[in-house]
UniProtKB/Swiss-Prot annotation:
InterPro entries: Bet_v_I/MLP (IPR000916), Bet_v_I_allergen (IPR024949), Plant_def-hormone_signal (IPR050279), START-like_dom_sf (IPR023393). It comes from Pisum sativum. Gene3D superfamilies: 3.30.530.20. Belongs to the BetVI family. CDD domains: Bet_v1-like (cd07816). Induction: Upon contact with the plant pathogens fungus Fusarium solani, Pseudomonas syringae pv pisi, and the fungal elicitor chitosan. One of its GO terms (cellular component) is cytoplasm. The keyword Lipid metabolism does not apply. This is Disease resistance response protein Pi176.
Length: 159
């Protein structure tokens, strides 16, 4: 098994606590509202905390697919959230899981800095994700982040 790590950082004009609420606490209901391709996020097992399994259903290339998220950490006090994608329809068979560790902190002018660590765990001697795949995955993640940021900005009473 290989482990391939990618670090990323993105800033927002939205305050950390409000952004965390949109990205984590309310994500299951907000995300399908702000991203057309995402049809639903539902809890399959658990209560939303560590160990919870969520099913995210989406449409890609005209085909309905889903991935399973396993929640590993929900730390509201420290604005941290960790989860792994552990399977699903359309999930690469060469990958065991993709783990995400996210943390929000105070940024300039009352905004936020989001730090993200992504680890790809490949099966056997499978190759690392291609540069094209990494760029595609980053674009999807950035798109989700910015869509939820736009929601917060468009709804100033959201807190």
């Amino acid at each position: 098994m290989g482990v391939f790590n990618v670090e990323d950082e993105i800033t927002s004009v939205v305050a950390p606590a409000i952004l965390y609420k949109a990205l984590v606490t309310d994500a299951d209901t907000l995300t399908p509202k702000v991203i057309d391709a995402i049809k639903s996020i539902e809890i399959v097992e658990g209560n939303g905390g560590a160990g919870t399994i969520k099913k995210l259903t989406f449409v890609e290339d005209g085909e309905t697919k889903h991935v399973l998220h396993k929640v590993e950490l929900v730390d509201v006090a420290n604005l941290a959230y960790n989860y792994s994608i552990v399977g699903g329809v359309g999930f690469p068979d060469t990958v065991e899981k993709i783990s995400f560790e996210a943390k929000l902190s105070a940024g300039p002018n009352g905004g936020s800095i989001a730090k993200l660590s992504v680890k790809y765990y490949t099966k056997g001697d499978a190759a690392a994700p291609t540069e094209e795949q990494l760029k595609s995955d980053k674009a999807k993640g950035d798109g989700l982040f910015k869509a939820l940021e736009r929601y917060c900005l468009a709804h100033p009473d959201y807190n």
